[in-house]
Design a protein with these regions (language model features):
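N-terminal beta1-alpha1 cap of cysteine-dependent amidohydrolase-like domains
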Residues: 21-111
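Catalytic-core regions built around general acid/base machinery
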Residues: 101, 126-138
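C-terminal and late-domain segments of enzyme folds
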Residues: 21-50, 69-70, 75-77, 156-157, ...
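Bacterial Sec-dependent N-terminal signal peptides
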Residues: 1-22
């Protein structure tokens, strides 16, 4: 029954993607500092013309103005395009002026914070629809930290569900049904993403996600590092590493629910490397 949570979301996404593969790109950052080079790569990926504008969505954070201030300053060094702050609330989900601007943005940037807070505002609303329309029509959608986690259809919330459920940077156990997965934006349907990966040693968390969804590659992006996704092609940019778990073999559990398996594929990539999602 683990897919029940996503039944409505799948129907929602099928309606949006019925006209084919999205034309846009995803620029998924693992959190932490963003070097000038990484920001320049982001701007280059978006292929901004002089008339294009950038929308920042800061709803993940409790300090949206601060988050907007910092990313705006970084982007202004790399380009001269107009940068707009759209801090949607639940009352704004039908704001036609904002929604029209959002769906016609050439670059959308989602800040860090709490991915669940963001999705509580956006999920199954015209805001999500506008983001997906922009992406389908060729926009680049970028996100960092929480903004990275929510890119997937299957979003890691960071919560563990068994035993000590106090939030920790990583998981202290590998057990069945310990990881909480909720519905994300659905921009990345063929993989699950985690962030701050090497710095916060989130291997147990990502292995738990792989055990829950063994058919999906699970991607851990470290800080100051990004993956650039175009269709099924992925390129790595930035200062650190990207770890990918996939191809889990003979998954099973003991009587206490501990995860067991015989083999998996582990890949590590750095700046300039490319890999492929799917068969």
């Amino acid at each position: 029954m683990k897919h029940k949570l996503f039944f409505t979301g799948i129907s929602f996404l099928l309606c949006l993607y019925s006209f084919g593969q999205a034309k846009g790109k995803l620029f998924i950052i693992g959190g932490g500092d963003r070097s000038p080079e990484l920001i320049q790569t982001l701007v280059s990926t978006a292929q901004l013309s002089a008339k294009d504008y950038i929308v920042v969505l800061p709803m993940s954070t409790e300090e949206p103005d601060t988050a907007y201030y910092y990313i705006k300053g970084e982007l202004e060094v790399a380009c001269s395009n107009r940068i707009v702050n759209m801090n949607f609330t639940k009352k704004d989900t039908s704001n036609t002026k904002w929604l029209d601007s959002l769906q016609h943005a050439r670059l959308i940037f989602i800040t860090g914070g709490d991915q669940t807070r963001f999705m509580n505002i956006v999920l199954h609303t015209p805001i999500q629809r506008a983001i997906l329309k922009a992406y389908n029509n060729g926009a680049t959608v970028a996100g960092t930290s929480a903004g990275a986690a929510m890119m997937s259809s299957h979003m890691i919330t960071g919560n563990n569900l068994l035993g000590d459920t106090t939030y920790h940077a990583t998981f202290k156990q590998l057990r069945k049904d310990n990881i909480e997965i909720q519905e994300g934006l659905g921009l990345l349907t063929s993989a699950i993403v985690d962030q701050h990966f090497v710095v916060r040693s989130r291997y147990n968390r990502l292995l738990s996600a792989l055990a829950k969804y063994p058919g999906l590659p699970c991607i851990g992006i470290d800080e100051a590092t990004a993956i650039i996704v175009h269709g099924k092609n992925v390129k790595v940019a930035g200062d650190s590493q990207v770890i990918v778990f996939s191809n889990l073999k003979n998954l099973r559990y003991d009587a206490k629910g501990h995860i067991k398996f015989d083999d998996l594929r582990l890949s590590i990539y750095t700046d300039g490397d490319n890999f492929h999602l799917g068969k």
